[in-house]
Curated annotation (Swiss-Prot):
Name recorded for this polypeptide: Prostaglandin-E(2) 9-reductase
InterPro entries membership: AKR (IPR020471), AKR1C (IPR044482), Aldo/ket_reductase_CS (IPR018170), NADP_OxRdtase_dom (IPR023210), NADP_OxRdtase_dom_sf (IPR036812)
GO biological-process terms attached to the record: prostaglandin biosynthetic process
Family: Belongs to the aldo/keto reductase family.
Originating organism: Oryctolagus cuniculus
Site note Required for substrate specificity, residues: F54
Gene name in the database record: AKR1C5
GO MF entries: 17-alpha,20-alpha-dihydroxypregn-4-en-3-one dehydrogenase [NAD(P)+] activity; prostaglandin E2 9-reductase activity
Pfam families listed in its UniProt record: Aldo_ket_red (PF00248)
Principal cellular location given in the protein's record: cytoplasm
Gene Ontology CC terms, in alphabetical order: cytoplasm
Length: 323
């Protein structure tokens, strides 16, 4: 089997490709770029495509996937597509309609994975982040377990093959895992994860529960001022990662991606540049010896790029706990 298509088993029997293509881009990037980049990614060998309602690009990403099916490059079953339930749709009666909305935009019959994007419910409505007159996000009170039951129904209805979560801490995962009458446990927890925030404890916990950790911002994150502190260190400019890149004759990005794969993490690589998209899939062509893995481990400083400040103060804000 082509190493590019390496997959790992999820707890429900489905398989997820270990390397995924991330499609998020800042607001000012034209949505058409997501379509072009997704086509390039599929041509390069990516089979796992990650998007979300929040990214507002599912029409374009769906178009890219369908055009690659139409031209014979892939079949629908070759593609593993992830979408995410946004915070304004946590009320149980809104979960399925939100997924159906994504499917309509995608023009697909099902998603391979549907995940709760963030554990904090926001006031339902058309605004992505509803705010009061002081510019503060308006929270909603929804039991996360009730949202999860609605997710389970989406799986039973065949609209999502697998269901999972994102940005959950240990306590929030345990709330679902210990829920009376739990039908399906989350197959994954998609979180920010890179050498500066290596999530060692959360990874260990997830592995112990058969939950796959999926890494976003694996290359250190975009620099969008609304979401990321502009003084944040640039991961790919780290001298230790640079030295390892030189040693292995790879790019710093490939070192950061390879590090995650060797820890048993499913990793998302985000780039809209053709050259880099094609480079990133070369992550299967080399290995890091354990001493290099230890060097990268030593870079951990629990530094988070995506702090989701809009949700600070919400009872379910996930990043106040240690992990």
């Amino acid at each position: 089997m082509d190493p590019k298509f390496q997959r790992v088993a999820l707890s429900d029997g489905h398989f997820i490709p270990v390397l995924g293509f991330g499609t998020y881009a800042p607001e000012e990037v034209p949505k058409s770029k997501a379509m072009e980049a997704t086509k390039i990614a599929i041509d390069a060998g990516f089979r796992h495509i990650d998007s979300a309602y929040f990214y507002k690009n599912e029409k374009e990403v769906g178009l890219a996937i369908r055009s690659k099916i139409a031209d014979g490059t892939v079949k629908r079953e070759d593609i593993f597509y992830t979408s995410k339930l946004w915070c304004t749709f946590h009320r149980p009666e809104l979960v399925r309609p939100s997924l159906e909305d994504s499917l309509k935009n995608l023009q697909l019959d099902y998603v391979d994975l549907y995940i709760i994007h963030f554990p904090t419910a926001l006031k339902p409505g058309v605004e992505i982040i509803p705010t009061d007159e002081h510019g503060k996000a308006i929270f909603d009170t929804v039991d996360i377990c009730a949202t999860w039951e609605a997710m389970e129904k989406c799986k039973d209805a065949g609209l999502a093959k697998s269901i999972g979560v994102s940005n959950f801490n240990r306590r929030q995962l345990e709330m679902i895992l210990n829920k009376p009458g739990l039908k399906y446990k989350p197959v994954c927890n998609q979180v920010e994860c890179h050498p500066y925030l290596n999530q060692g404890k959360l990874l260990e916990f997830c592995k112990s529960k058969g939950i796959v950790l999926v890494a976003y911002s694996a290359l250190g994150s975009h620099r969008e001022p609304e979401w990321v502190d502009q003084s944040a260190p640039v991961l790919l400019e780290d001298p230790l990662i640079g030295a390892l890149a030189k040693k292995h004759q790879q790019t710093p990005a490939l070192i950061a991606l390879r590090y995650q794969l060797q820890r048993g993490i499913v990793v998302l690589a985000k780039s809209f540049t053709e050259k880099r998209i094609k480079e990133n899939i070369q992550v299967f062509e080399f290995q890091l010896p354990s001493e290099d893995m230890k060097v990268i481990d030593s870079l951990n400083r629990n530094f988070r790029y995506v702090t989701a400040d809009f949700a600070i103060g919400h009872p379910n804000y996930p990043f106040s706990d240690e992990y």
